[in-house]
A protein has these predicted regions:
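Alpha/propeptide regions of enzymes that mature by internal proteolysis
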Residues: 1-240
Length: 240
């Protein structure tokens, strides 16, 4: 995780954009087999390795991909959707579109699933203009079928960014999706009902069932970053 932070910090210090920083940090996490994203994604119950990723910016752009095969860095494909007419692509269609844009196609070996371990990755970056970019990537929750869609590529569930605030979630995707967790935490802050920290605590404690593991990170255009979880979720913030 330190290497990913250093990569994003270097981009931002050099005057790069929030999108560039978030994507490149996410790529480093996808390339690390420790995490359930990209090269470290877990097998589905049929033995396949299917990858989801999303990217949203505070200026209203969005891209997400679902169930991609043979794509070690799905976040790069999501990033290429930011300026397209369409927002999201899935399955074979997503891979075909990635081929047309020159994205590398390579088998992802993946790894066996692990009980009780999530390891989805998320990055939120802010550049010198105050613009935000929120990137997430996953191989999906362990022991799920090939057709299953979790929270990561679903707007408002695994991520939400607009009006100077970005929120990203990780954990049990079904619970996150049912509660529309990222959007509702985001809305609670914007409505001035809570701070970043208290809104995340509210979201997990009030919207998520007891015993379900979930974590959140958030960042505003004019403040520090924050993280909160009801389980062991490593997170870090760099303030340049």
């Amino acid at each position: 995780m330190e290497a990913a932070i250093a990569r994003a910090a270097g981009i931002l210090e050099a005057g790069g954009t929030a999108v560039e920083a978030a994507v490149e940090a996410c790529v480093m996490l996808e390339d690390d087999p420790v995490f359930n994203a990209g090269t470290g994604a877990v097998y589905r119950t049929d033995g396949s390795v299917l990858l989801d990723a999303s990217l949203q910016t505070s200026d209203g752009r969005m891209g997400f991909v679902i169930a991609m095969r043979d794509t070690p860095n799905p976040i790069r494909v999501a990033a290429d959707l930011l300026d397209e007419e369409i927002n999201g692509l899935a399955g074979n269609g997503a891979r075909a579109w990635a081929d047309s844009k020159g994205h590398p196609k390579a088998a992802v070996d993946g790894r066996p699933p692990r009980v009780g371990v999530g390891d989805t990755v998320g990055v939120i970056a802010r550049d010198f203009t105050g613009a935000l970019a929120c990137a997430t990537s996953t191989g999906g929750t362990s022991y799920r079928p090939a057709g299953r869609v979790g929270d990561v590529p679903l707007p408002g569930s695994g991520f939400w960014a607009e009006h100077g605030l970005a929120v990203a979630a990780t954990g049990a995707g079904e619970a996150i999706t049912r509660s529309l967790l990222s959007y509702r935490v985001h809305d609670r802050v914007l409505s001035k009902e809570a701070t970043l920290e208290s809104a995340m605590q509210w979201g997990i404690n009030e919207l998520i069932e007891d015993g379900v593991s979930v974590g959140l990170i958030s960042l505003a255009s004019d403040g520090g970053g924050a993280g909160y979880s009801n389980t062991d979720m490593p997170w870090a913030a760099w303030m340049g």
